[in-house]
């Protein structure tokens, strides 16, 4: 990033840590960019005339007499229709070999939308994954996390959602990705011919961890452009928010801030909320919906990152491996969409809420039957039928590799009801039984 002529140059750094450096400077703003010995940095703390800079590439090789030049602006992204189909790094620079994007330069990390300009979410976001669309329906303008163990195929799930989701634009923000994961997303999107509606901002494990902090703001700035300027439905996919939080912790620790729970900074809640609160439904029709992966350490849902996330978001989606079918499913017991009632049975078929509730109840009966069997108790005929139903339900609907529309999901569920149960055991309104029961 080039500097301008006649800019003031500072050459006396008072303190250097692994990720930050401090010096005395005046007329500097918070979040302002700077060049330190040729490396890009950003102002993260101002105390009087003492300014602390976060150096994205790390401070290795920077002497105390290094030249520091402040650029007079925060990180920016050039927004235009040319963003579509492109891959960028954390600074909004192309990494796909394509040309630079021409467009309006916009500062990233702006405020969330004023509540008076928001509309209550009311549009269905269909993903083709029954564990989401059937049981935990997503609504435009919603913010919801995917909780998953690090060894689960959450990136494949995100890629599937990107290809199947019925939205105008998909924006992927990848933080701490391996090169294999980056190439996986790139190849999947290219082979599916879907690049024209997908925009990706990627930080890999080969890039400095601190750069991850820019990825969500880059992705959301692009999302705001398409949602506001073009009134489009935009789905933002962020993976992995735990990597983002780890980068926050790195900067916080190297600034000698007192850590909070699980070594995370005390500002973690605000840092996460600033991202998630960008989800919005505009009265004009445009919307930003956020799905973000949060990996769990040893399945610990009480860790500071998922714990704070749960207070901010409108539900959560849990991935787990089902030992009976050997596939990863969306767990119906631990998953929840707090806004599904806004579209379930209204934007979908009228029998949707009752079918969803009945299926989950029968799946719970199967879980109880499995516990009885494991403890050596005899199973009733109903228990055996419930277990058989649960296996088919997981395989044909809950598994993440299943791709159906909501009407097909409901029809498959009705087929399973009639295969294993009597109408009175399913406990659904007679008008729906008369119309949809498979005879």
Each language-model region and where it sits:
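N-terminal accessory targeting/assembly segments
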Residues: 1-86, 91-95
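Active-site phosphate-binding and catalytic loops of NTP-dependent enzymes
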Residues: 3, 75-79, 94-99, 116-122, ...
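Residue-level signal for beta-strand positions within conserved beta-sheet cores that form or flank
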Residues: 9, 39, 64, 83, ...
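A generic structural signal for well-ordered coil/turn residues at beta-strand boundaries
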Residues: 9, 17, 30, 83, ...
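Residues that form or immediately flank small-molecule/cofactor binding pockets and catalytic motifs
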Residues: 18, 48, 92, 113, ...
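P-loop NTPase nucleotide-binding/switch module
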Residues: 66-68, 82, 95-142, 155-160, ...
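P-loop NTPase catalytic core
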Residues: 134-439
């Amino acid at each position: 990033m080039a500097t301008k002529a006649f800019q003031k140059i500072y050459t006396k750094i008072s303190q250097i840590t692994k990720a930050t450096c401090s010096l005395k400077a005046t007329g500097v703003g918070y979040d302002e960019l700077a060049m330190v010995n040729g490396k890009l940095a950003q102002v993260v703390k101002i105390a009087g005339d003492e300014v602390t800079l976060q150096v994205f590439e790390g401070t290795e090789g920077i002497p105390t007499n290094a030249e520091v030049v402040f650029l007079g602006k925060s990180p920016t992204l050039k927004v235009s229709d040319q963003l579509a189909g492109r891959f960028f790094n954390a600074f909004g620079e192309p990494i796909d070999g394509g040309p630079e994007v021409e467009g309006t330069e916009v500062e990233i990390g702006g405020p969330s939308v004023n509540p008076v300009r928001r509309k209550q979410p009311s549009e269905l976001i269909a993903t083709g994954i029954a564990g989401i669309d059937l049981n935990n329906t997503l609504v435009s303008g919603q913010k919801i996390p995917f909780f998953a163990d690090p060894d689960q195929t959450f990136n494949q799930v995100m890629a599937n959602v990107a290809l199947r989701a019925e939205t105008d634009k998909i924006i992927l923000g990848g933080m701490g990705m391996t090169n294999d994961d980056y190439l996986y997303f790139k190849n999947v999107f290219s082979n599916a011919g879907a690049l024209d509606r997908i925009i990706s901002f990627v930080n890999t494990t080969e890039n400095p961890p601190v750069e991850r902090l820019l990825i969500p703001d880059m992705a959301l700035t692009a999302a705001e452009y398409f949602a506001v300027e073009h009134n489009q439905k935009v789905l933002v996919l962020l993976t992995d928010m735990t990597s983002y939080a780890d980068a926050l912790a790195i900067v916080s620790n190297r600034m000698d801030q007192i850590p909070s729970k699980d070594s995370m900074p005390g500002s973690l809640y605000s840092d996460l909320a600033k991202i998630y609160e960008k989800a919005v439904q505009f009265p004009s029709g445009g919307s930003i919906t956020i799905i973000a992966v949060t990996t769990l350490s040893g399945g610990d849902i009480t860790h500071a990152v998922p714990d704070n996330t749960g207070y901010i978001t409108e539900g959560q989606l849990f991935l787990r491996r089902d030992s009976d079918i050997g596939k990863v499913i969306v767990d119906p017991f631990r998953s929840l969409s707090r806004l599904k009632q806004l579209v379930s049975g209204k934007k979908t078929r009228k029998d949707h809420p009752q079918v969803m509730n009945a299926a989950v109840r029968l799946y719970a009966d199967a879980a109880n039957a499995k516990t009885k069997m494991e403890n050596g108790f005899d199973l009733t005929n109903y228990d055996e039928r419930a277990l058989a139903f649960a296996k088919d339900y997981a395989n044909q609907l809950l598994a993440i590799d299943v791709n159906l529309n909501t009407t097909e999901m409901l029809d498959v569920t009705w087929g399973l009801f009639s295969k294993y149960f009597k109408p009175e055991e399913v406990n659904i309104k007679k008008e729906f039984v008369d119309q949809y029961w498979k005879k």
